[in-house]
Amino acid sequence: TVDPIREAAAICAAHDAIIEINAHCRQPELREIGCGETLLADSDRLTKYVEAAAAEGAVVSVKVRAEVPGVDLPALAREMEVAGADVIHVDAMDSEAVIRDVAAASDLFVIANNEVRDRASVQKYLGYGADAVSVGRPSREPTGAVMRRVAAAVEEWEAPIQ
């Protein structure tokens, strides 16, 4: 049912917040109830969720993962854009170049995720056409150190050329 999506989206819209629909997580307990990664194989249901959230006036993000057999992320990005999504948040796994394909396929705001740790990873993703990057779990390093490096790299990327 889309009712919980509508309710959450209405709250997000009222608070100028983003609702992110999880078509990403692969934990068995989420997949068993039809959430997370299972939505990638059920684009009709995912589309209904996006349409319901967008109808409430919320900014809608869809988090997806690369390397799921049978899933064409650029085509899915186009579908999500038509359904009313504003953002696609891509866990690029071991296929960073998928960011380029997704960015070229739609006008969605693209957030790249996976192994964002430093200047090189930020520049790689932004170079592929991502509009932003997100940091998941900083492996063994303290979160603050990773975040400072990523923030500096983004600032450097966005600095005006003199």
Residue ranges: model-predicted function:
Residues T1-P74, E96:
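Active-site entrance/lid segments in N-terminal catalytic domains of soluble metabolic enzymes
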Residues D3-H15, V68-M80, A104-A112, V116-V135:
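Catalytic cores of alpha/beta
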Residues H15-P28, A85-S95, Y128-V150:
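Glycine-rich phosphate-binding active-site loops on the catalytic face of alpha/beta enzymes
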Residues R31-G34, D101-A105, R137-Q162:
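C-terminal helical cap(s) of enzyme catalytic domains, especially alpha/beta-barrels
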Residues G36-T38, E79, A152:
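Residue-level signature of transmembrane alpha-helix interfaces in integral membrane proteins
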Residues T38, D42, R65, I88-A92, ...:
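Glycine- and other small-residue-rich loops at beta-strand/loop junctions that grip anionic moieties
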Residues R45-E56, V71-G84, M93-D107, V116-R119:
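Short loop-to-alpha-helix "cap/lid" segments that border enzyme active sites
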Residues K48-A52, I111-V122, S139-G144, E158-Q162:
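Short, basic, helix/turn surface patches
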